[in-house]
Amino acid sequence: MNLEQLYDVIVVGGGHAGTEAALAAARLGVKTLLLTHNIDLLGQMSCNPAIGGIGKGHLVKEIDALDGAMAKAADQAGIQFRILNASKGPAVRATRAQADRVLYRKAIRTQLQSQANLTIFQQAVDDLKIEGGLVTGVVTQMGLTLKARAVVLTVGTFLGGKIHVGMNQYAGGRAGDPPSIALSKSLRDLDLPVGRLKTGTPPRIDRRTIDFSQMVEQPGDTPVPVFSYLGTASDHPQQVPCHITHTTEATHDIIRNNLDKSPMYAGVIEGVGPRYCPSIEDKIVRFADKTSHQIFVEPEGLTTEEIYPNGISTSLPFEVQVQFVRTIKGFENAHITRPGYAIEYDYFDPRGLTSFLQTKAIPNLFFAGQINGTTGYEEAAAQGIIAGMNAALQIKDQELWCPRRDEAYIGVLIDDLITCGTQEPYRMFTSRAEYRLLLREDNADLRLTEKGRQLGLVGDERWDSFSKKREAIESTQALLHNSWVRVHHNDLFKEALLNPMQHDCRAAEFLKRPEINYQHLLMMDDLNLPELPQEITEQIEIQNKYAGYIDRQQQEIEKLRKHENTMLPETLDYNDVVGLSSEVIQKLNRIKPTSLAQAGRISGVTPAALSLLLVHLKKSRLPV
């Protein structure tokens, strides 16, 4: 490594944001350096060993559509795959993979080490070099100055990180890793708007001390789903089940009796925790009427005995953790291998960023991941690919890019952050997107891969595969719109049809019937339809069956725009508005916005919530 070399882009941090940022910049052909405090922990899953879920799976598919690493790594490391919301509409269906931590790190490292234009170096960063309002490089822990034309910071929970277990606290970026204290101070000296957030993790348990007979087994799906558009089920390692258990009233009693020892409830922690991933202490206090809470018992990998009990994140003292864990069904003899803990860390107000994730104060300095106030691997990776790409585009003097809200969940994520900011760790949900019928998991490639190719992100293998898929969809749709299903075909479909056809119709129209799928149409020899892979026939079916819903949603969006200046009465009690989440009610009652437009700029108040407000105003005969 030549210390005098000028890198185009330096990425600081080797987590989920940093790895995607470094790969994206390198794919665009610029000289990229990835700095990490530990090469062995590139792509480390610091908390739960899982990828995807509601809203999050959509982000993973979009990252994959732009030729990112996360979906491919999840396929190579996933030890259980499930489609969540499988019985619901395609807009909210989401893929989730339980992952082997070791295999995931290995898959990410393999992609990094095989990427052209990318150098990896193990060094923590203590400072940025700033000259003339621009960043010119970084200073490492051992005093090396590394020069760059752009820098991407993806430092996770390491900035000013402080770990809490009971009343004990110590500096740390995560358990076993040092924090970035010097870099945190350097960034604060730049007068960037800074705050503190908190997250936590549960104790880990030795599988051999668990009685699984008291639990409900949760197998994966068959056939086994895949994450990457280039993936197949043969990419997956051995598949294993998860299990479900529950806390008991004894669990709750122990936690209630020890709340004074919780750093959260004793006022020791200043940072705000994630609303949608509360600690077990929070659950007991906030949902005092519940006699039990569900726990997902998840394996950490194929070569470890450690189990991740998803649902009991805690910062209570270790001896209290042992007590309450052993009151949970199946955990009566549990041996804790690692204590649960809370960690608080610095983040910077994302309203100080452009939509390209560059800081407004220093235009060649980019932020991605938890430094922007988000929580979750997927949210971090989504920001990473955008920040790394835009850092490279800036170097190449090309126009920067970020998807719009109607193009991608990545666009929703970034727009929410830079427009509204966040005072609590931001997690993606499908409910945050007003265009969710357009932004499905199944069509992320159709939405983004062509743009990714234009930008230089998408390689030849993905582009060739995508082009063939798109051609198959378009040519088959043309056939369906120009072919007819006749009334006399009623006999052919009599076992499937809920109601017989009354008149001839185009095949595309016939496919809109809920009981009819593409396989039924293949029964008609005169249509000459091709045999196609499931992912293509599924896309064709969805495009036809949901065409009317998508059109209606677009009309709703237009209507909503017309009502942006609708005034909201000061006396309006948002508890009376049917359908609003507790988060939205809480924020609206506290802020009391004067108009629908102002309400829409409040973090967490989605366009769907604005529609509910509009309906309430009309029903209440309040002026609209």
UniProtKB/Swiss-Prot annotation:
Which InterPro entries does its entry note? FAD/NAD-bd_sf, GIDA_C_N, MnmG, MnmG-rel, MnmG-rel_CS, MnmG_C, MnmG_C_subdom, MnmG_C_subdom_sf
Q: Which residues form a coiled coil?
A: none
Q: Which PROSITE patterns match?
A: GIDA_1, GIDA_2
Q: Which GO terms describe its molecular function?
A: flavin adenine dinucleotide binding
Q: Where is the signal peptide?
A: none
One of its Pfam families is GIDA
The positions annotated for binding NAD(+) are 273-287
Sorted alphabetically, which keywords does the UniProt record give?
Cytoplasm, FAD, Flavoprotein, NAD, tRNA processing
Subunit comment for this entry? Homodimer. Heterotetramer of two MnmE and two MnmG subunits.
Record-linked PANTHER family: GLUCOSE INHIBITED DIVISION PROTEIN A, PROTEIN MTO1 HOMOLOG, MITOCHONDRIAL
Q: Which family does it belong to?
A: Belongs to the MnmG family.
**What protein name is recorded for this chain?**
tRNA uridine 5-carboxymethylaminomethyl modification enzyme MnmG
Q: Give the encoding gene's name.
A: mnmG
